[in-house]
From Swiss-Prot:
Sorted UniProt keywords: ATP-binding, Kinase, Nucleotide biosynthesis, Nucleotide-binding, Transferase
Annotated GO MF terms: ATP binding; dTMP kinase activity
Binding-site list for ATP: 11-18
Free-text function comment from the UniProt entry: Phosphorylation of dTMP to form dTDP in both de novo and salvage pathways of dTTP synthesis.
Classification via HAMAP family: Thymidylate_kinase
BP terms from Gene Ontology: dTDP biosynthetic process; dTTP biosynthetic process; dUDP biosynthetic process
CDD domains in the cross-refs: TMPK (cd01672)
Family the UniProt entry places it in: Belongs to the thymidylate kinase family.
GO CC, one annotated term: cytosol
Name of the protein in question: Thymidylate kinase
Pfam family name, one: Thymidylate_kin
Cysteine pairs bridged by disulfides in the record: none
Entry keyword Kinase: yes
Species this chain originates from: Acidovorax sp. (strain JS42)
Amino acid sequence: MTNGAFITFEGIDGAGKSSHIDALAQALRAAGHTVALTREPGGTPLAEKLREMLLHDSMDALTEALLVFAARRDHLRCVIEPALARGEVVLCDRFTDATFAYQGAGRGFDLEVLSYMERLAQTGVGLQPDLMRNPDLTLWFDVPPEVAAQRLSAARAPDRFESQPVEFFTRVARGYADRAAGAPQRFARIDSSQPREQVAAQLRAVVAARGWLAQTP
């Protein structure tokens, strides 16, 4: 794959997306692809430091958004764009859709301001100076917020986002639905309320339909 591929995993906390990233990476490698695994916020030394601040320090929505896009710019420049230029498949746990869902829909931050930050941070970091980088495919793990909350309660100690009330995640889920409606060619909805094996089958079918894996008979 000479041009690489950029695949993002999205969904509210507790949707179960992160547990499927490694399995997809293994399947893609078995199919002959070189795969880069990364996450947001994070992926570089600078972005990981900003991640720690975002997850554990108290701040308002504007500060969150500024830190997220600063981390994203560094991540694109240092990790994502170089990997794509090498023809790799980049699997990223969250990207800009999460910012619109969490800071936009969840926190109520101005979507027009987020769009401006998006253009500023994501333009001119690749081979084409006027290109705004977006994913080739976004796998949206959709689950009722109540189900996600039950999963989180049984997991590790929650961070600042995971400890938000169900009402917050209901707004975030609506934000993801709005993003999916606005980019139907890029988004693929995965019903992650189903058992793990069925979720994995949905995931593989979507990726196979894009030509990155063999179709399952």
